[in-house]
Amino acid sequence: MTEISRFDAYPPTLTVNPIVPADAPATEHLVWTIAQAAEERKAGDLVILKVTDVSYLADYFVICTGFSRTQVRAIADNIEKQVELVHGQLPTHTEGNSESIWVLQDFGDVLVHTFMPEEREFYKLEAFWGHAQEQTLADIATAIGVAYNAPTSP
């Protein structure tokens, strides 16, 4: 039986930077795709934690904020859509989509947490995983061999 994506009815278009060297590390490439997809939907306060040395759950956590339930859902949907297009994979598990105050997406080596501001402040994952190594998009870009120009404020 063939698995059908919920995006099959309206095929999405690739919007994240697809030009990544073929020999780029797969996990960092996945983090790059997730971060770019989140930023595309105007996610706030994007944090990337490398938890390889402190957790067996995943290699990376990507944490971001949406400022309405609609935006949280849009961020999570765009991440799923772009990861499926670029990497051909869907999350193995997703929680919180119906409430859209905290959506957790499990992509195996990368866990994505998209929060509303109040929930992010309450759970404080960055503090809980404070011993993890924080990465920037520039760090991830360097790891996969692409150029990254940080957005400038107007």
UniProtKB/Swiss-Prot annotation:
BP GO annotations: cytosolic ribosome assembly; negative regulation of ribosome biogenesis; negative regulation of translation
Record carries keyword Oxidoreductase: no
The entry's keywords: Cytoplasm, Repressor, Translation regulation
One cellular component term from this protein's GO annotations in UniProt: cytoplasm
Cellular localisation: Cytoplasm
Protein origin, superkingdom: Bacteria
Sample GO molecular function, one term: ribosomal large subunit binding
SUPFAM superfamilies per UniProt: Nucleotidyltransferase (SSF81301)
InterPro entries in alphabetical order: Iojap/RsfS/C7orf30 (IPR004394), NT_sf (IPR043519)
Broad class of the protein's primary localization: cytoplasm
Similarity comment text for this entry: Belongs to the Iojap/RsfS family.
Function (record text): Functions as a ribosomal silencing factor. Interacts with ribosomal protein uL14 (rplN), blocking formation of intersubunit bridge B8. Prevents association of the 30S and 50S ribosomal subunits and the formation of functional ribosomes, thus repressing translation.
Binding partners and assembly: Interacts with ribosomal protein uL14 (rplN).
Name of the molecule in the record: Ribosomal silencing factor RsfS
Record lineage: Bacteria, Bacillati, Cyanobacteriota, Cyanophyceae, Synechococcales
Gene that specifies this protein: rsfS
